[in-house]
Amino acid sequence: MARVTVEDCIDKVESPYELVLVAKERAVQLNSGLEPTLDRDNDKNTVISLREIAADTIKVSDLTDSAIHKLRKHVEQVDDGTDDDEIIGDDFESMYKGEISKSGTPILPSKRARKIPEKIQVSSDDLEELTAKAEPEVDVDAELEVGDEETAVSLDQIAEAETEAETTEVNSDDSETTNS
């Protein structure tokens, strides 16, 4: 076959759209490393997939199922018929210790585990290292630490100074408006 056309493949599928879907799926399989059923003949994977469909070396139904399976968001699980719930049992009663919150609802084990604080074990070497780091490395003069009473200003004094400044601004604004 020198050249593959849609007419060569259209009798193998129901519509040209399905042909595109099936050929694309086979090209993806070839890109992922599957070996082609025909000789490559220096062709690209899309051409090889069309040649395989035209020559019936690959089943179209398998490619359709593969494409549909990949596009599904929820893959159906095969149930073997055994009921696992009865074998495992209900562990809620064994885990629940009977604690009840203030609102009257039971406290589940996962909630209790979050409320219990984790105890941290610290060695004595770590404590010594932390206390050594907590001490300041810079010497501070005692005179600078204790403020003079003359320079100490309370918040009330600052608030009074701000209100005085505002009233003087308002008075100066009033005098400017009357002068003009």
UniProtKB/Swiss-Prot annotation:
Gene Ontology biological process: DNA-templated transcription
Catalytic function, reaction form: RNA(n) + a ribonucleoside 5'-triphosphate = RNA(n+1) + diphosphate
Domain of life: Bacteria
GO cellular component: DNA-directed RNA polymerase complex
Biased composition (Acidic residues): 137-151, 159-180
Record-linked Pfam families: RNA_pol_Rpb6
Top enzyme class: transferase
UniProt keyword list: DNA-directed RNA polymerase, Nucleotidyltransferase, Transcription, Transferase
PANTHER family documented for this protein: DNA-DIRECTED RNA POLYMERASE SUBUNIT OMEGA
Name of the protein in its database record: DNA-directed RNA polymerase subunit omega
Species name: Pelagibacter ubique (strain HTCC1062)
